[in-house]
Amino acid sequence: MKSLILCFLLTLCVMLTLVPSVALAAEERYGVWILDEEITSSRKISRKEGWEFDPNTYTLTLRNFQIGTIGTKISALFDKYSLFGLIYVDTSVHDLTIRVEGRENYLGDEAFPYENCTKYKEAYYGIYATNTNLTITGNRGAILKIQTHENAIECKNLTIKDSVTVEAVSQGTCIYSGGDITIEGVGTIVNARTTDIIKGQATMSARGKLYVGEGALDHMFRG
């Protein structure tokens, strides 16, 4: 009997040594979705697609990243069409930095600001992060272009800095913050424009304060 137990234990030990250590570790989820998939400990970089995530600093780096209509569905009591976020951030994420590198970073499609939804009854947000303090930064001269049906950027508090350029166009409110909007740093440029399909919408709206630092520029256009 003892020999059978010993044999069983030895067999079990051998089996455990054959199991990869990765399989034993639980996959960590970070609450940020890109290209319709959540960023996890096993999926936090794609050199081919041009993005990388650092979980230690909660920084998502975009390197000439381009995305059109691959988004994460947003739960909403809305029956006219389905809503999606091209970059979607869960409400559990309180702080996120998006670092932009290169001049060819695009979210959305040039047709989106001139229509209510696509022919498939889908409407897109650019960066959807309603409970998140969002910072957009990058190297000098980096450009992020966002063209969407719904808000190009929606977040809690928004900071754009460090000489990046953000160009955003949507059919309604282009940039919406549930708190403050801060634009700072010499050479930082924000071009926000609404096509005004939804009448009376602001290009940039904050429930808190709007601060534009010395040397930074914000341009807000309608139509």
Regions inferred by a protein language model and the residue ranges of each:
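A composition-driven surface/loop motif
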Residues: 24-223
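Intrinsic structural disorder/low-complexity segments
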Residues: 9-13, 204
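Intrinsic disorder/low-complexity segments
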Residues: 4-5, 18, 174
